[in-house]
Amino acid sequence: MLEKTKELSSTVKLVNNKLHFMGSVDNNEPVSIDYISPLGDDLGYTSLELLLLSLSSCIGSSVLTFLRRMNKTISSCEIKSRGFRKEEHPTGFRKIEVNILLGSGDLTDEDVRKVIALSEDKYCPVYSMIKASTEVIISHYIQRN
């Protein structure tokens, strides 16, 4: 169980003469981070792409955890996200759309809405950190099996 007081630390190291970094947290696998041409070489994820992945996986983790605690059978889960950037600097996201695609034979829309609300309100720290500055719209679709 993750301790609430656990301190996380990361390291990013420059690997070329542009903006290509290798980053890691603790003993996890490194991730390649770069910037778009001409400043970078497109050799890895951009920082905003990593933010989208972090948000999607954070929401997905909390949603799946609560659905499983409700004894729901989940045969598949795919989360697609799209970020819409601001025109002015800093050109971070002004809006992010997250679509959760779930495969299940016993899941209801109400079940999913309930756990999404829990994720938004309390259990997804990435969402909690960005919600004040970025509109986040979460939708879902259930594929019946």
Task: Indicate residue ranges for each PLM-predicted region.
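Heme-based O2/NO sensor domains and their adjacent alpha-helical segments
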Residues: 62
